[in-house]
């Protein structure tokens, strides 16, 4: 899972256009990552970069700043799907340091970065009150983090528990002899 529909806390200053919305910069607001909006946004996450830390990316800043390129440790695949309440995707991480962090659980959780339009109307989602909803979500990147805001169930995970190489080897004549 790379994200999920849920209610999360955000400081006012983290909310786009907070001043125009009359929000206090240091007050905590609870925002709903709206499931309908997250489903609509699925395609915008396809083939986005996976970064070793959160840095807003644009075509201009990534082309002009070679240091930003060093933060790129992988990519989201082209299969992104909303399976309530989760946004799921295949991931490819190619950086050895990032892989080591994942394997040791140091940076196994994920945090999506996106642009969105906040609609500050209160409501309730699955028993959780919220102050506003995220709408018009557009994926920007995915970051490997120690603790993600979406929760400990939004993590890098291997969804295939079988080692097909070993299975194929066991089924071959040599494999049968070796594993007998």
Per-region residue spans from a language model:
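Extended Gly/Ser/Thr-rich low-complexity repeat segments
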Residues: 38-54, 99-116
């Amino acid at each position: 899972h790379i994200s999920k529909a849920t209610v999360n806390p955000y400081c006012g200053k983290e909310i786009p256009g907070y001043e125009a919305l009359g929000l206090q910069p240091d007050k905590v607001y609870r925002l709903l990552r709206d499931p309908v909006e997250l489903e609509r946004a699925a395609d915008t996450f396809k083939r986005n970069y996976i970064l070793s830390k959160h840095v807003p990316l644009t075509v201009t800043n990534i082309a002009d700043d070679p240091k930003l390129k060093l933060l790129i440790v992988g990519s989201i695949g082209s299969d992104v799907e909303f399976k309530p309440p989760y946004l799921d995707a295949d991931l490819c991480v190619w950086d050895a340091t990032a892989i080591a962090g994942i394997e040791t659980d140091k940076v196994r959780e994920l945090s999506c970065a996106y642009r969105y339009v906040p609609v500050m109307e209160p409501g309730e989602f699955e028993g959780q009150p919220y102050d506003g909803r995220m709408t018009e979500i557009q994926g920007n990147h995915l970051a490997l983090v120690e603790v993600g805001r979406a929760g400990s169930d939004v993590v890098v995970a291997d969804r295939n528990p079988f080692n097909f190489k070993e299975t194929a080897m066991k089924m071959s004549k040599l494999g049968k002899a070796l594993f007998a």
